[in-house]
């Protein structure tokens, strides 16, 4: 799917046909959040069709290039073996809210999928850290295009916080 032009809200206007039963909405002109790109992600993938659906810790080496003045925030990151990476899926349409990911007419809401097509196209991956060098972190496990804007880096929360136990049952109290 090719990217379209940006509207005044910085949203990609969907430039290809919608799939059967998909629905797009008009986007608001202004947002209420301001994000800073802290760097750029370097990967081997130049097109969405080449990009894996999900990253793998066995995948190719990718590099997180941290821009100034944010590079100083890397202090201590080398202590972690895995990081959670948040990035802006800059070529994803933002106006499609009902999607048919398999192009089979079956519809799902954007919030019920991990697809890159969503109102706020924020991607997230848990990556394996290979090395930290200067303003760069070399990792494995990404699934985004080369040049993707980097939003944030966090230690993988599952390394420091125990996972919640699985509930054996769930019931709604009687009214």
Swiss-Prot record:
Q: Which Pfam families match?
A: TrmO_N
What the entry lists under InterPro entries is as follows: TrmO-like_N, UPF0066_cons_site, YaeB-like, YaeB-like_sf, YaeB_N_sf
Domain of life the protein comes from = Bacteria
Which Gene3D superfamilies would you find in this protein's record?
A: YaeB-like (2.40.30.70)
**Keywords of this entry:** Plasmid, S-adenosyl-L-methionine
Which residues span the membrane? none
**Residues where S-adenosyl-L-methionine binds:** 52-54, 90-91, 114, 124, 145-148
The residue ranges of the TsaA-like domain are 35-165
Family recorded in the similarity comment: Belongs to the tRNA methyltransferase O family.
Per its record, how is this protein called by name? Probable S-adenosyl-L-methionine-binding protein VirR
Protein's organism:
Rhizobium radiobacter
Q: What is the lineage of its organism?
A: Bacteria, Pseudomonadati, Pseudomonadota, Alphaproteobacteria, Hyphomicrobiales
């Amino acid at each position: 799917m090719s990217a379209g032009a940006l509207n005044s809200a910085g949203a990609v206007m969907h430039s290809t046909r919608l799939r059967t039963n998909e629905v797009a909405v008009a986007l608001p002109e202004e947002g209420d959040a301001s994000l800073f790109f802290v760097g750029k992600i370097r990967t081997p993938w130049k097109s969405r069709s080449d990009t894996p659906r999900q990253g793998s810790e066995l995948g190719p080496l990718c590099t997180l290039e941290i821009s100034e003045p944010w590079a100083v925030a890397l202090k201590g990151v080398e202590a972690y073996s895995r990081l959670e990476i948040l990035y802006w899926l800059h070529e994803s349409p933002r106006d499609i809210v009902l999607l048919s990911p398999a192009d089979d007419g079956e519809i799902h809401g954007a919030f019920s999928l991990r697809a890159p097509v969503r109102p706020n196209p924020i991607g997230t991956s848990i990556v394996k850290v290979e090395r930290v060098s200067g303003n760069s972190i070399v990792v494995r496990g990404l699934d985004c295009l080369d040049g993707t804007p980097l939003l944030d880096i966090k230690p993988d929360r599952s390394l420091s916080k125990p996972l919640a136990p699985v509930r054996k049952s769930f019931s709604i109290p009687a009214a």
